[in-house]
Amino acid sequence: MLIGTLEIGRDAPPVIVAELSGNHNGSLERALAIVESAAACGAHALKLQTYTADTMTLDLNEREFTSSSPLWKGRSLHNLYQEAYTPWEWHEPLFRRARELGMLAFSTPFDFTSVDFLQSLDVPAYKIASFENIDLPLIRRVAATGKPIIMSTGMATLAELDEAVQAARDAGCRDLVLLQCTSSYPADPAYSNLANIPRLRELFNCEAGLSDHTLGIGASVASVALGATLIERHFTLARADGGVDSAFSLEPQELAQLVRETKIAWQALGTVHIGPTKIEMGSRSKRRSLYICRDLEAGAVLTPDNLRAIRPGHGLPPKFLDQLLGKRVTRRVARGTPASWDLIG
């Protein structure tokens, strides 16, 4: 499948999406610097989040409207979203800069108004966040745009995922990527369940990838071996700068390494082929083979003392050793002669 000009699939290197989230810390200048750094690291796409605090929650301090996550424990949801949101007037300059640097640029909408706003910017795709994968009306509204959908699967049961996928397809979605996701911040690798990736592809007949909140890049690189074709990571200039999502975001050197290592992992997958590869053919002549290891006169008997399996591989294969032992050579043979059938007549 294509998103813009990016090919998403197992015949192409994994697409790496850098998520800006709230790491701009309220500064457009910093947000643009993050975009430029992501491009310099080789990220293929930039993703924003499009909401306001009021479209996400209510401005209340009751317990159910406060965060229980260790990172944000006790803070009101409204306050968190007010701090983290990306002003809508920033979207156009951020998208423009990303495109200038060769990246795809899209966003996650959280309500109908944000879908309509993103449509006005002609985004090439939409992301559905894990916390919204049960919001079927929102999914239908996004699907009705006809744009590809990337959907995180965090917290969802199989039945809920089936409902979400069916809602998207019934409303017009033709290109879908499901991302294995653990909605914990940061996430413990023990709960990443990367083995779900091929299962998602099989069950829903779509591309599958990973939205990764673990620390480091190990889980992300490993996901490629299980068929991940798109990997999303939060990104910041420096975790020490702080910010609502900085604790589980990659820094530039990590993102650059992720781009390199996931491409290497994809290349290393290769194909199902048991047998020598093209680049191994020259090494076959350096394998073990049978050699005469003592000077022999005509009529001498071949024994373990004068016939051995050694490197290189210009003699008969070692599997013929037992057949040759006890045979007599028909002529004088010098030490270092590769064994051949004509030595015994």
What are these regions (language model features)?
Residues M1-G345:
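Catalytic cores and adjacent flexible loops of soluble metabolic enzymes
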